Amino acid sequence: MSTVGTGKLTRAQRRAAARKNKRNTRVVQPVIVEPIASGQGKAIKAWTGYSVSKWTASCAAAEAKVTSAITISLPNELSSERNKQLKVGRVLLWLGLLPSVSGTVKSCVTETQTTAAASFQVALAVADNSKDVVAAMYPEAFKGITLEQLTADLTIYLYSSAALTEGDVIVHLEVEHVRPTFDDSFTPVY
């Protein structure tokens, strides 16, 4: 016995029903990035309305057991006056080390200190290769400051237990900031 209205749905009706139910049939896989030290790393997405700018600073030659300071400079695309006023979110600092580097290498981002050796006492997070933590994440420390204040008031400090030659250590700085608005017209000077 058949009942009324149990006919087969057409393709258009099935698609309309699927749209109405909004069932997500896709399986979303997390993006796995190659870990910096050991274990599995997972990419952290930027907040909505934010983007992440990445730049590197090559370390100059450094003596053993001496803390050196590296100034933070903005990439060219963020150095306009309007982009310097963008608010900062989270900051990530990580170290790229050549295999020839031996001994402990530490790095941190803090407010500019009068003595470089005091920087690690006030740092909220330290990237340290001897502890397999070659990255330091600052989720709340610099939140709300502008990119201009980031470059003017903050400094990267690097300590090595062994002497370093130029290019042995590359410091990677990744800053999450409000997404910039780029100009879509030329300056009217003609």
Curated annotation (Swiss-Prot):
Modification sites for N-acetylserine: S2
Cell compartments where the protein resides: Virion
UniProt feature, compositional bias: Basic residues: 11-24
GO molecular function, one term: structural molecule activity
Lineage of origin: Viruses, Riboviria, Orthornavirae, Kitrinoviricota, Alsuviricetes
One Pfam family it belongs to: Bromo_coat
UniProt remark on domains: The N-terminal arginine-rich stretch does not seem to be the major RNA-binding region that allows formation of an infectious ribonucleoprotein complex.
Gene Ontology, cellular component aspect: ribonucleoprotein complex; T=3 icosahedral viral capsid; viral nucleocapsid
SUPFAM superfamilies on file: Positive stranded ssRNA viruses
Domain of life, source organism: Viruses
Membership in a protein family: Belongs to the bromovirus capsid protein family.
Keywords for this protein: Acetylation, Capsid protein, Ribonucleoprotein, RNA-binding, T=3 icosahedral capsid protein, Viral nucleoprotein, Virion
Annotated segments matching region Disordered: 1-24
Protein name as catalogued: Capsid protein
UniProt-listed InterPro entries: Bromo_CP
Function text: Capsid protein. Probably binds RNA and plays a role in packaging.
